[in-house]
């Protein structure tokens, strides 16, 4: 998804874009059929209750956590599912625990903050002075946005598990370091844009 989005933003003509997109769509089912564990993940996604103690266990426990949270949650540190019921509760399925402790309202507030961050990233990309900064800011924003959406879809059982963490929230070493570094780069581009605008205003005032 990220590669296709970056190619599109890079200005590739639509017919060439389709030449890449169509084989990629055809390759997805082939890649799923090649590995048995991918088929198991797909079957668990389609019907988790068919194997409630095996492949479907994680998704079922995730849905239990979200359902237990209700509208306003059970309260901070009052989650039950994180105590060895939900696997990877601190990483891939941290959103389920957030939903259990803070409820649907808490998840909505979290996603509102995510939308604000994505908006800031898009604005930074749009205000970039050069094409490289535009692509870099767009790439960082897309990585964050795509990972956030995919993680939410996995936790809610909308798509099969992918193993992607929730950026800036999930625990982890490499993923967290890379995400923080990416946000630092995005902030650097935003700051340079602000400095360029300030310099431009100063030059205009001097000319007047």
Describe each PLM feature range.
Residues 9, 47-50, 67, 99, ...:
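Signal for well-folded cores of large energy- and translation-related assemblies
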Residues 123-163, 169:
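Loop-to-helix entry and N-terminal half of a specific, functionally important transmembrane alpha helix
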Residues 35-39, 115-118, 122, 142, ...:
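Alpha-helical transmembrane segments of polytopic integral membrane proteins
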Residues 149-208:
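A juxtamembrane structural motif centered on a specific transmembrane helix
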Residues 1-5, 22-30, 105-116, 138, ...:
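Lipid-exposed faces of alpha-helical membrane segments in multi-pass integral membrane proteins
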Residues 13-14, 52, 168-169:
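Interfacial loop-to-helix junctions that mark the boundaries of transmembrane helices
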Residues 16-108, 128-136:
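Hydrophobic, glycine- and aromatic-enriched re-entrant/interface helices and adjoining loop segments
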Residues 1-37, 123-129, 186-203:
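Alpha-helical transmembrane bundle and helix-membrane interface signal
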């Amino acid at each position: 998804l990220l590669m296709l989005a970056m190619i599109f933003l890079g200005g590739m003509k639509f017919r060439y874009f389709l030449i890449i997109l169509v084989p990629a769509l055809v390759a997805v089912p082939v890649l799923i059929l090649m590995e048995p564990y991918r088929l198991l993940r797909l079957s668990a996604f389609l019907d988790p209750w068919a194997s409630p103690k095996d492949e479907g266990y994680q998704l079922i426990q995730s849905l239990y956590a979200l359902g237990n949270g209700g509208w306003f949650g059970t309260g901070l540190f009052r989650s039950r599912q994180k105590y060895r019921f939900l696997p990877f509760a601190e990483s891939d399925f941290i959103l389920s625990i957030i939903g259990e402790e803070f409820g649907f309202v808490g998840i909505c507030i979290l996603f509102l903050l995510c939308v604000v961050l994505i908006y800031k990233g898009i604005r930074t990309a749009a205000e970039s002075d050069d094409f490289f900064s535009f692509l870099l800011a767009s790439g960082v924003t897309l990585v964050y946005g795509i990972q956030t959406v995919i993680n939410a879809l996995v936790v809610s059982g909308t798509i099969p598990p992918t193993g992607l963490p929730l950026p800036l929230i999930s625990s982890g070493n490499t993923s967290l370091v890379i995400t923080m570094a990416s946000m630092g780069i995005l902030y650097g581009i935003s700051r340079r844009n602000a400095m360029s605008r300030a310099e431009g205003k100063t030059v205009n005032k001097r000319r007047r």
